[in-house]
A protein has these predicted regions:
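Alpha-helical transmembrane segments and immediately membrane-proximal extracytoplasmic
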Residues: 1-436
């Protein structure tokens, strides 16, 4: 009888915790869903408005000055970096509430006036800051505020991109690579599902494509996909390093933050006029769609990386993920025919596998492929992501991303003097290039 009572008490405890997080996760989803939807609609408006009024590009340096002033005045320590949310989750420290309006306004301004940036990284900050402060307002413990922050990240990511499964797994996977907090699975998924439902009701359509060309997983095609995955891993390393080096160069030559951002705006204007196209301003979703349809300019991936690095490095705001999609899709579209793969499939593989290499989130990348491309060629997507993940070493888009396990052996890794090293004494190696 006592054993039965213990089991009943245990079951009651599980049910109570489950009910608690269903309610809290639903609350987060109902809060960040409208925010994410409004953010996505505002960015769509910004890009459409810039297309209708090309002269707005000439105001980009002025917009940069306003953005820098706002951050210098209201968030001098944060700076609007996605790395903030990683620290918040790892150290159980909710972001300040002012993070949300700052990243919202500054990202919309960057897109409106022609900067090259994305939106998902900004959405992580938007949702994470609001939900973390919601946890504080409810007087939750620090560890529960951490989970609330993760729910907000998943909910906002899902709301703006329309991929609840990828948003959930990405939130669990990306902060500490190799350690997924499965206790957060249900709450994050609930927030993500509600987030995408609400944003859909607001009129924000989810990202979805239909592949016009497929390939069977034959041995020949598997080899081709492995080669493409290896090329994308190299491209991910280059892109990550470019995004890390560019701010250092800006700081070296332009120590004044206002001169720095104004210079970045002028450079974007000059490059846009030199090229005679606005394809590389804003998010560039039209170019992504064209690449998945099999059309891409051979040098488009290089130019998008350059525009994005110049924009974000100067101090403009926004995410990096959509530019990664742009870069991967255009590169894959161009490279795939050289390997004997359809350009449409190559663009899709490039989009997902480059995302994997830059963010070190293979499971989320596979989920992204399933949701965005409807499960077509899922085995090829998984293979490309696996190769890109392994060969991208310990480079990362995010400096605050930590690695817990080796990518090459079943051993742990630790950071020693800024480099990730295997902890197995028998195979102790130091990656001199994998500094984050």
């Amino acid at each position: 009888m006592e054993q039965i009572k213990r089991h009943l008490r245990s079951a009651a405890g599980y049910l109570a915790v489950c009910a608690k997080w269903l309610v809290l996760a639903a609350l987060v989803g109902c809060v960040v869903g409208p925010l994410g939807g409004a953010f996505g609609l505002a960015l769509n408006w910004a890009n459409a408005t810039r297309g209708a009024y090309p002269w707005l590009l000439y105001l980009l340096p002025v917009a940069g000055l306003v953005i820098v002033f706002l951050y210098h005045r209201f968030d001098p320590d944060g700076g609007g970096s996605t790395n903030q949310i990683f620290v918040s989750v790892r150290e159980h420290k909710p972001l300040t509430l002012r993070t949300a309006p700052l990243i919202f306004v500054s990202t919309v301004a960057t897109h409106l006036f022609g900067g090259s940036s994305g939106r998902e990284g900004a959405a992580l900050l938007l949702g994470g800051s609001v939900s973390g402060q919601l946890g504080r307002a409810l007087r939750l413990e620090n560890r529960d505020c951490r989970l609330m922050t993760m729910c907000g990240m998943a909910g906002a990511f899902s709301a703006i991109f329309g991929t609840p499964l990828a948003a959930t797994i990405f939130t669990l996977e990306v902060v500490d690579v190799g350690s997924m907090q499965y206790a957060a699975l249900l709450p994050c998924l609930v927030s993500a599902l509600l987030g995408v439902f609400i944003s859909g009701k607001m009129g924000l359509a989810p990202e979805a494509f239909v592949l016009q060309a497929e390939a069977a997983p034959t041995p020949d095609n598997l080899v081709r996909v492995i080669i493409l995955g290896a090329l994308l891993s190299a491209l991910s390393i280059f892109f990550c390093e470019l995004l890390h080096v560019t701010p250092k160069l800006y700081r070296k030559f332009f120590p004044n933050i206002y001169l720095r951002v104004a210079t970045g705006g002028v450079l974007i204007i000059a490059l846009t006029k030199l090229l005679g196209t606005t394809d590389y301003n804003g998010a560039g979703t039209a170019v992504i769609e064209a690449a998945i349809d099999g059309e891409a300019v051979p040098c488009a991936f290089l130019l998008k990386m350059l525009f994005t690095a110049l924009t974000l490095g100067a101090g403009f705001k926004g995410g990096e993920i959509v530019p990664i999609f742009f870069t991967g899709a255009t590169f894959g579209c161009v490279a795939a025919p050289l390997l004997g793969l359809p350009p449409q499939l190559g663009a899709a593989l490039g989009m997902v596998a480059l995302f994997c290499g830059c963010t070190n989130s293979p499971l989320a990348s596979i989920c992204l492929a399933i949701e965005v491309f409807g499960g077509q060629c899922v085995s090829l997507f998984a293979l490309a992501c696996a190769v890109s993940y392994m060969l991208s070493s310990y480079f990362s888009l995010y400096r605050e991303q930590h690695f817990l396990h080796s990518k090459l052996r079943i051993v742990g890794v630790q950071r020693v003097h800024g480099h990730w090293s295997e902890t197995d004494a028998a195979h102790l190696t130091t990656n001199d290039d994998g500094e984050n």
